[in-house]
Amino acid sequence: MERWSINESAKVYNLDNWGADLFSINKKGNICVHPSSNSKNAIDLRALVDDLIKRKIKPPILLRFMDVLQGRIASINRVFRNAIAENDYPAKYQTFYPIKVNQQRQVVEAIASYGKRYNIGLEVGSKPELVAGIAISTGNGLPIICNGYKDAEYIETVLFATRVGYNITIVVEKLFELEKIIELAKKTGIRPSLGIRVKLSSKGTGKWATSGGEDAKFGLRMSEIMAAIKMLQEADLLDCVNLLHSHIGSQVTKIDKIKTALIEAARIYSEMRKLGVNIQYLDIGGGLGVDYDGSKSSYFSSVNYTVEEYANDVIYQIKNICDEAGVDCPNIISESGRATVAHYSVLVTNVLNTNTQNLMPDYEQILEEMEKPAPTVKKLLDIYKSIDRYSLREDYHDTLQLINEAVSLFNLGYLTLQDRAIAEWLYSKIIKKINSIVEKIKPIPEELQNFQLALRQTYFANFSLFQSIPDSWAIDQLFPIMPLQRLGQRPDVMASIADITCDSDGEITSFVGENGRSKFLPMHKLKKDEDYYIGFFLIGAYQEILGDLHNLFGDTNAVHITFNKKTGYMIDTVINGDATWETLKYVQYKGPEILKHVRDNLEKQVAIKKVSIEESSHFIELLDRTLLGYTYLGE
């Protein structure tokens, strides 16, 4: 067997660049997760999955590593505190978690608990999120910021929540909202805590660049800010404004765009302070990105800066502008949800099968027994036997021409089905032989660089792309994917990953590779009776809540895990994935009614002796078991 090391696997999957020192490969060749960056403690993911299956927790399984979540919260706050100290910044930093990034109750509760020492807050953007935020903050005084569109009921709820002791700030997104706020504040006699969202001319970069700029969906233009100040003065509520908010989009890939936005926001803050608006907080919104592909570039799946650089620029730019303007520096708020939760969850699942030709007939034997192969088949066979490095280009082009010719002749009725099957088999053999030669040639001829797509095998995995990783399908987001095991062995298959939905879009064909974006995922040949698992990493932000019920595949099993020095890990919580009856209920089917309808029909079939009692009973038993079972595939 060809020598291969775990270091070579780490390089192939670019692990060291996207893993943020939270993932590594152990001596067994299994990928591990660490509770914090550079920690020596680790959990072997393959061993963990084996243990979970023994506990009857079936894949796909969403693994939530709560120590990683805690570490990310601590890390972001630490780098900001360091930046404050280095720049002698006279105010404080505070992080607010936008719960839209991952609204799962257990996740938000954990963030609230871990973040208490940092005075973490919650950002909400709708009435349901407001109610969730109030529930989480009850008893612990967590501050809440309300963004998004608001109606009278929303505003009144916030006002009375403020009246009974909750620390909630309403951010004004539009002037008509401010009119409602002023009206309800006067009606209830409750003075609100207010923020104003400004529409910066600065834009971000990447997929969400339109969140900033003059055409942004939210925020007040400069003329509208002046109008808002006048409205608040006339209502005697100007002193209620204590926050200025801006946001140029999620996953900002370029640090220079962030700097430009910070300067503009700080200038607006300074001018508003000079106008007598006693703003205490400058909320710079989200945008702190995640390096999904490890390229450290301005590509939309990466960022060209570190968290440390981001924090230093935030503190420096704001302090510089405020000192220049002669105004007090504000307390700084950021809403860095993606950077907080992306790393803490991993989806693991099993590979079910591949589209390899292992089950194909022995065409070599068939060819030997054929008296006179079809001319097209004969030409392909001759190429296969004679190909070498000196005839690669010509043979490759001839092969493409001949396989197209075989299809045309078949459609015209001049080739049999067996002839076409043999032609396809020979085409595959020729491409593999070319590949074995090309791998030894440097540089690879340009016209041969993309031919490897013909070698790409499809690995079918037990998951729904639309449910678990919707951004991969919707916006072509890259997420790191790699096997959990056999990483001490050379991967010998170039693969794509297909899910189990009945949709051709349910396939991943772009991957994080050694040299950037790749059309292949290196995988190992499947062994008989071996369970082969893959992991989807950095999926903690947005994926769970954006997932849909395509083909009625529901939520996966989820497990909350913490590290334990004695036992390696502890399972804190197991959240069962959706059963079939639950996903059917979403679309207005009821399990008991289904069973009754089918049973009534079966009884009629039994009565006329078309179906036996035993067959009827067994079918109902199977149907009932399916309704109660996991929506994903078993053995």
From Swiss-Prot:
Entry keywords, A to Z: Decarboxylase, Lyase, Magnesium, Metal-binding, Polyamine biosynthesis, Pyridoxal phosphate, Spermidine biosynthesis
Catalytic activity: L-arginine + H(+) = agmatine + CO2
Chain positions found as N6-(pyridoxal phosphate)lysine: 100
Keyword Metal-binding: yes
Pathway field: Amine and polyamine biosynthesis; agmatine biosynthesis; agmatine from L-arginine: step 1/1
Uppermost EC category: lyase
InterPro entries, alphabetized: Ala_racemase/Decarboxylase_C (IPR009006), Arg_decarb_HB (IPR040634), Arg_decarbox_C (IPR041128), Arg_decrbxlase (IPR002985), De-COase2_CS (IPR022657), De-COase2_N (IPR022644), De-COase2_pyr-phos_BS (IPR022653), Orn/DAP/Arg_de-COase (IPR000183)
Binding site for substrate: 282-292
Protein function: Catalyzes the biosynthesis of agmatine from arginine.
Similarity-based family: Belongs to the Orn/Lys/Arg decarboxylase class-II family. SpeA subfamily.
Protein name: Biosynthetic arginine decarboxylase
Organism: Trichlorobacter lovleyi (strain ATCC BAA-1151 / DSM 17278 / SZ)
